Amino acid sequence: MRITQILLCLVIVALSSSSHVWSDQIFPAHLVGTFSRNNREPKYKIEFLPEDSPFHPGDNLESMVMLDKHGNRFLCYLPKEEKATSGWTSSQQNISTVMMETQQLVKLKTPDELLQPLSEKCLFRQEGWWSYEFCHQKYVRQLHVEDENKIVQEFFLGTFDPEATAAFNQTVSDASTDASQRYHSHVYTNGTTCDLTGSPREVEVRFVCAETRAMVTSITELSTCKYALTVQCPTLCKHPLFQLEKPVSHTIHCNAIPVEEDATRNKEEQAVDESPKMIADS
């Protein structure tokens, strides 16, 4: 669907649901809302302006006469559709920009460097019978503790494996994933032998960006004796790949058409057989 058609639908929805009582308003413009399909796509705000304080458009806008359900006429200005200069989507261009900025910042710390504060102490998570201990770049342990911190049962889910980690991160890319869902992984292998498979336990530790404190947020068994442990880390948010792309924001301005101008415009439209789009009253 072309962007003009999408914007037209947004304006129609706004006109259908909005009442325009200019004399009762404190502010000259009436902001209906912000529209966007996701946090990467451009955001569009729609503002309705009264006759005595109209919007003055530039040359880069398209205009269209619209009717609301009360028959009031508005001249709305929509951003012109940009001609595609490449086969890339706006999301891909955003990602490409982030990658280029990342490469240009020579002193930018890598995700592993940003994770170093986790080495200061081990993190724990309690889930029912079991407790889980994560010691950064050392090991992940599953244990059951009773009175006075007495360990009565324990399994090592894995010890840090730098070679397996490097190989894993070479084959997995999060560039196409929304920044809020990206994570950086470390692989821990050679854990306690699994009774069901006869192989050592393994765990993938997934580090995610979170502004709150560092903590283990979840532990999942992906398959028999193979686990995924999620750790949130505030310092990881400093890396561009884990920062949310800020979408471009546009405002669609709709000027109330004065009665005199409305009559003139009606005659012109009838002469060229151009009628405004009517919005059905629901």
Curated annotation (Swiss-Prot):
Residues 1-23 form the signal peptide. GO terms for cellular component: endoplasmic reticulum; plastid. The gene is OS9. Disulfide bonds join 122-135, 194-225, 209-237. One of its GO terms (biological process) is endoplasmic reticulum unfolded protein response. One of its GO terms (molecular function) is carbohydrate binding. Glycans are attached at residues 94, 169, 190. Changing residue 221 to A: Loss of function in ERAD. Residues 262-276 have a biased composition (Basic and acidic residues). This is Protein OS-9 homolog. InterPro entries: Man6P_isomerase_rcpt-bd_dom_sf (IPR009011), MRH_dom (IPR044865), OS-9-like (IPR045149), OS9-like_dom (IPR012913). Keywords: Disulfide bond, Endoplasmic reticulum, Glycoprotein, Lectin, Signal. Residues 262-282 are annotated as: Disordered. A mannooligosaccharide derivative binds at residues 129-130, 142, 195, 201, 221, 227. Belongs to the OS-9 family. Disruption phenotype: No visible phenotype under normal growth conditions, but mutant plants have enhanced sensitivity to salt stress. Lectin which functions in endoplasmic reticulum (ER) quality control and ER-associated degradation (ERAD). May bind terminally misfolded non-glycosylated proteins as well as improperly folded glycoproteins, retain them in the ER, and possibly transfer them to the ubiquitination machinery and promote their degradation. Targets the misfolded LRR receptor kinase BRI1 and the misfolded receptor-like kinase EFR. Interacts with HRD3A. Changing residue 142 to E: Loss of function in ERAD.
